[in-house]
Each structure stands twice: as structure tokens, then as C-alpha cells.
Amino acid sequence: MAKKTKSKVNTINAKLQLVMKSGKYVLGTQQALTTLRQGRSKLVVIANNCPPIRRAEVEYYCTLSKTPIHHYSGNNLDLGTACGKPFRTCVLSVTNVGDSDIAT
């Protein structure tokens, strides 16, 4: 069971890295909310230790704009590392998937 979960995380991380190279994205709650309000977001990724108020606000705007949400199994440090950044991030909004098939 743990092996399956780990391979699933590796798959998501690989897709995220492909988005970082070939697609367009914004990091952070405020920027993600802006893209959601403008209707430019294709997918939103939320870390599992995102504060509940932020999580609820992002999920609310996702339902309004009919944008899919992916709940990342790692914490915000893991999400930042998967994005290739040296800092933590709770929310990632993908505006252009590029060569990745992460939105499917």
C-alpha cells in the first residue's frame, strides 16, 4: 500500500516539474485567488497543511469558477520543493499546463 502511494506522489511531482518547465503557473494564495476570479486557472493544487480559512476560501472560488482542485498529500514545504522552489507554498494555480497532462 505504501508503495502505491509513493508512486502516486512521484507521478504528481513529475507532472508538477513538467508544468514548471513548459507551462505557466502562480504560487501563493493571493495570486491563485486572482487567477481564479479572472477565470484563468486550469487547476489548483493545495498542500495538506494549508490553514483551514485559506483552504475554504480557495475551494469556494474553485467551485464558483468550476476549476478542479488537487489536494497535495505532502505539506507546504514538500509542495514548494516539488515545484523546484527553495521556499514553502500552500497554493499553486496552473494557468497553462504546457506539455503536462496534470489537469486530466
Curated annotation (Swiss-Prot):
GO terms for molecular function: RNA binding. The keyword Ribosomal protein applies. The keyword Ribosomal protein applies. Keywords: Ribonucleoprotein, Ribosomal protein. Signal peptide: none annotated. GO terms for cellular component: ribonucleoprotein complex; ribosome. It comes from the Eukaryota. SUPFAM superfamilies: L30e-like. InterPro entries: Ribosomal_eL30-like, Ribosomal_eL30-like_sf, Ribosomal_eL30_CS, Ribosomal_eL8/eL30/eS12/Gad45. Belongs to the eukaryotic ribosomal protein eL30 family. This is Large ribosomal subunit protein eL30. It comes from Leishmania major. The lineage of its organism: Eukaryota, Discoba, Euglenozoa, Kinetoplastea, Metakinetoplastina.
